Amino acid sequence: MKKLLILSGKGGTGKTTTAAAFIRFAGARSVADCDVDAPNLALVSGGYPETRETDFKGSDKAKIDENLCIGCGKCAKMCRFGAISPAGGGKYAVDELRCEGCGLCTEVCPVGAARLDKDIAGSLRVRSGDGVFADAELRMGRGNSGKLVTEVKRALYDAAGEAELAIIDGSPGVGCPVMASMNGVSLALIVTEPSVSGFGDMQRLVRTASMARVRTAVCVNRSDVSP
């Protein structure tokens, strides 16, 4: 299977629009949106009436059982992230957005009221019908975006079977989700624009792809809009 990854570096260059055009003109039946922070390729890609959605479990998060908590406050004093605070009634609770899952609270709690649970950090969707479309969405304030991108690609490849071509819409930037999306692709197409930031981010992507040993090509978009 040939795997075409479409990236941009700078946001707003027309990456997703270009990806949608490639999907249509190539007649691609295996498609993925790996922009897990803000997936939107599905808005311009129809023909997938059936959806199978599963939870994505990311890092651990602390929980405090209020029935066991004795209100000693040791967990709150030891938490360097300020994720534990009084919750009323002499009990303590965890702010899931602040918690880093280090597990220190579970070690210092004298009654075992604190525990670590796998956090549902997002959702993974596989749509089918006129082909296969995989995407995902990360919940606000969650990490593990690179891991979720890997899960999206794995779901696509498993469902695509013997398809000859897969087109993947990556995320902007050069961070973890972009690095994860580059793994194993045949070619990375960088959609850029003739602006200072567009050119600079394109150069960063080319260097990143070179380190990952991924071939690159460049599409200069919006040439008559941002001369």
Model-identified regions with their sequence ranges:
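Walker A (P-loop) phosphate-binding motif
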Residues: 1-26
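Residue-level preference for the first positions of well-ordered beta-strands
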Residues: 3-5, 28-30, 165-167
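Ferredoxin-like iron-sulfur electron-transfer modules
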Residues: 22-25, 48-71, 82-101, 130
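Short beta-strand-centered segment that lines the nucleotide-binding/catalytic pocket of NTP-utilizing
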Residues: 29-42, 117-124
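Iron-sulfur cluster-binding cysteine motifs and their immediate structural context
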Residues: 74-94, 104-119
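Phosphate-binding/switch loop-helix module in NTP-utilizing enzymes
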Residues: 83-91, 95-100, 106, 138-177
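Conserved catalytic-core segment of NTP-binding enzymes
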Residues: 111, 118-123, 147, 151-227
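FAD-binding core/adjacent interface of flavoenzyme oxidoreductases
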Residues: 113-148
